[in-house]
Amino acid sequence: MTELSIRPDEIRDALQRFVSEYQPDAASKEEVGTVAQAGDGIARVSGLPSAMANELLEFEDGTMGLALNLDTREIGVVILGDFEGIEEGQTVRRTGEILSVPVGDNFMGRVVDPLGKPIDGLGEIEAETRRALELQAPTVMQRKSVHEPLATGIKAIDSMTPIGRGQRQLIIGDRATGKTTIAIDTIINQKQNWESGDPAKQVRCIYVAIGQKGSTIASVRGALEEAGALEYTTIVASPASDSAGFKYLAPYTGSAIGQHWMYDGKHVLIIFDDLTKQAEAYRAVSLLLRRPPGREAYPGDVFYLHSRLLERCAKLSDDMGAGSMTGLPIIETKANDVSAYIPTNVISITDGQIFLQSDLFASNQRPAIDVGVSVSRVGGSAMTKAMKAVTGSLKVDLAQFRAMEAFAMFASDLDAASRQQLDRGQRLMALLKQPAYSPYPVEEMTVSLWLGTSGRLDKVPTEDVLRFEREFLDFLRRSHEGILSAIRETLKFEDDTESSLEDAYNSFLDQFQTSEGGSIKVGHEPEAEALADEDVEQEQIVRQKRG
């Protein structure tokens, strides 16, 4: 049996080698809090005395939370994600970071959640950088007045309530009156600009869905994909199944993605659908955090909630790159009541509103825009010269028609001027009808509105107005493409363009027939039939009474 020998020299050398190579870990200091209470997407955390407002906190299971209430002894935290695994007594750590989202061109064509994570099953998104959600809006000196048009492709909007790049235009109306359809049409109408490849014309679009049904968000994505508009659109989705915290943050996520492009000198269109649901989510969060309620139980800072969001939409000065972000917030009313708290707040923040009436929608006047109440406070300076030339007094005429419409049933007793105003108003209303997802190019819209405002449709039966417009535009594309291209390239409606259009109109009248088979060309009217004897007697009696 061998003896165990101890060699002190080897032991000493090994110890000396270990001591010389030893590197102690750097001392670390970490603030750790404890969950005192959790439920309904809210957690109250004790400890963490150095936590900042809007700081991200990490729970034990990796779920993130947002510190909103900084009380004396506790922090009120909104849980961002699934809160089922968060229990009383768990530890909470500070991250030292403010909530931010990844941004970049790779987000176009994708659907993401309010944290910027993809939810469309198409893989991860490679971001260019990150951007804070709570970011200061451009200052007064960094802005420029709105002067460039942003065409929606909707005749009733581009002619009477035009929108400029950098403008905030509210879309307001009852549920199921076509608010989302107007927003989607506006996105689809940017396709021609996108395909031009000109950065000065291209508009990147962001659609923020707040509290919508999942099926509705899927149908919007499908409509954009079918129209070829998804390639330049980002969808930020916070469906109805999401927590109130996610619905509250979703608009800021969309705004952060858009601001990245705006400060890069590009043009952005962002749609918030809809801010009523965001305000309701913020109300729920505030009540759960025990903040004092105000009017309609909303917290006192609900105006600031929307103002700091919508003020980020701007037209930047040339020194800042001349980028722009145009905002189309949507607000849902109850029984057409625009005097409620949230509608009046957003109306006062925005640069105009498009008011949709449920009775117009029910009478098949779509888009159901009430031109008497709708207004654009800054878009007029961004209107193209061609549109200005053909619209003229269109808005006033239609507002007067709406006021006189109640007397339409007494048309036989009205004077000739009033009857003519009613007839033209009916034809203009018919002309402004437009199916969903079919925006008009600016040149075709100019020609269409010229037909209505110049009286060229006065002899066309009301039921034939849209068919006349469609066939006349087809006729111009086939035989007079030069007229349309002149308007498209110059965005002007010159005298020679109008005279050429007049000649084309007269040529078209030779081939157009009404639904009853008649012609509307002067000199081709059917002869009036002779009155029957009893009708002659009746006419004479009426004249004697009037005489």
From Swiss-Prot:
**Ligand binding (ATP):** 173-180
Q: Which UniProt keywords apply?
A: ATP synthesis, ATP-binding, Cell membrane, CF(1), Hydrogen ion transport, Ion transport, Membrane, Nucleotide-binding, Translocase, Transport
A molecular function (GO) term: proton-transporting ATP synthase activity, rotational mechanism
Task: Return the Acidic residues bias intervals.
Answer: 528-538
PANTHER family annotated for this entry?
Answer: ATP SYNTHASE SUBUNIT ALPHA, MITOCHONDRIAL (PTHR48082:SF2)
Similarity comment: Belongs to the ATPase alpha/beta chains family.
Under which name does UniProt file this protein? ATP synthase subunit alpha
Q: Which organism is it from?
A: Nocardioides sp. (strain ATCC BAA-499 / JS614)
